[in-house]
């Protein structure tokens, strides 16, 4: 990996992003992907105290469902800290994640419309739940990066004209291409190079040490924060290794 690298965002919103990283090795790109999935801590419900559950679902099944509800995770929480959430819903009604009331306003369900259980007449769900920090490598419910992938940046160059009687066969390429120094998403031409360059012979090559990442979070944190924390976790592990070797 070079001493300097460059990051260019191609598309992004609160929960997903596509960005280009130049100047990194395939090993670092894969390490960053793994860190976004496994090493960034998030809050998830871990323990329940059930006051009333007259629904058709066992307490243990409710615990599994509640544990998979993504919670917003402030960056000032430390390992071992907990936050308590409570829910009290009477039927006939559907209990949703938005019915969870948190003891910390900064910690809320990332989505309010996740169904937990449908309650019939005279049924009630009342409980308290403790959420703790954890990492995806310990349990999948703590995976802040729910979809993380990358691929080499492809450079496309026109090298000639096709023959007069040569058909334009579909040439599928997905992701992002580099054309004369510009970045172009392949969705603009239906992922088919023959539509972008009709009648042209093109050459496609991988750009060395340049990778396009596609990242989506579960809503526990913005996508930029997920990427930065993943990079910080790699740096922290490198420091730990350096200290261990120096002993």
From Swiss-Prot:
Gene Ontology biological process: DNA-templated transcription
EC number: 2.7.7.6
Tree of life domain: Archaea
Location within or outside the cell: Cytoplasm
Top class in the EC scheme: transferase
GO molecular function: DNA binding; DNA-directed RNA polymerase activity; protein dimerization activity
Keywords: Cytoplasm, DNA-directed RNA polymerase, Nucleotidyltransferase, Transcription, Transferase
Pfam families: RNA_pol_A_bac (PF01000), RNA_pol_L (PF01193)
Reaction catalysed by this enzyme: RNA(n) + a ribonucleoside 5'-triphosphate = RNA(n+1) + diphosphate
Location, primary (coarse class): cytoplasm
GO cellular component: cytoplasm; DNA-directed RNA polymerase complex
Keyword Ion transport listed: no
Gene3D superfamilies: 3.30.70.3110, DNA-directed RNA polymerase, insert domain (2.170.120.12), RNA polymerase, RBP11-like subunit (3.30.1360.10)
Function according to Swiss-Prot or TrEMBL: DNA-dependent RNA polymerase (RNAP) catalyzes the transcription of DNA into RNA using the four ribonucleoside triphosphates as substrates.
NCBIfam families hit by this protein: PRK00783.1
Assigned protein family: Belongs to the archaeal Rpo3/eukaryotic RPB3 RNA polymerase subunit family.
Subunit structure, interactors included: Part of the RNA polymerase complex.
Family annotation (PANTHER family): DNA-DIRECTED RNA POLYMERASE (PTHR11800), DNA-DIRECTED RNA POLYMERASE II SUBUNIT RPB3 (PTHR11800:SF2)
Entry protein name: DNA-directed RNA polymerase subunit Rpo3
Species of the source: Natronomonas pharaonis (strain ATCC 35678 / DSM 2160 / CIP 103997 / JCM 8858 / NBRC 14720 / NCIMB 2260 / Gabara)
Gene behind the chain: rpo3
């Amino acid at each position: 990996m070079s001493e300097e690298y460059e990051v260019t965002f191609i598309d992004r919103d609160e929960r997903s992003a596509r960005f280009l990283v130049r100047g990194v090795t395939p090993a670092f790109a894969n390490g960053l992907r793994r860190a976004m999935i496994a090493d960034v801590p998030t809050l998830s419900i871990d323990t329940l105290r059930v006051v009333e559950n007259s629904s058709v679902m066992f307490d243990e099944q409710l615990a599994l469902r509640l544990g998979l509800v993504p919670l917003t995770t402030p960056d000032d929480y430390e390992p071992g800290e907990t936050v308590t959430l409570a829910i009290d819903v009477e039927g006939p009604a559907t209990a949703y994640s938005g019915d969870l009331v948190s003891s910390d306003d900064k910690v809320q369900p990332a989505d309010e419309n996740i169904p937990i259980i449908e309650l019939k007449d005279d049924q009630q769900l009342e409980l308290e739940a403790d959420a703790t920090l954890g990492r995806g490598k310990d349990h999948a419910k703590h995976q802040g990066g729910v979809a993380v992938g990358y691929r080499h940046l492809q450079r496309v160059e026109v090298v000639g004209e096709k023959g007069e009687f040569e058909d334009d066969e579909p040439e599928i390429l997905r992701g992002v291409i580099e054309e004369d120094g510009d970045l172009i998403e392949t969705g603009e031409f239906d992922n088919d190079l023959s539509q972008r360059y009709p009648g042209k012979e093109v050459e496609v090559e991988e750009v060395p040490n340049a990778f396009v990442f596609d990242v989506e979070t579960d809503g526990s944190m913005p996508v930029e924060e997920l990427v930065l924390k993943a990079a910080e976790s790699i740096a922290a592990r490198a420091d730990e290794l350096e200290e261990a070797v120096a002993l």
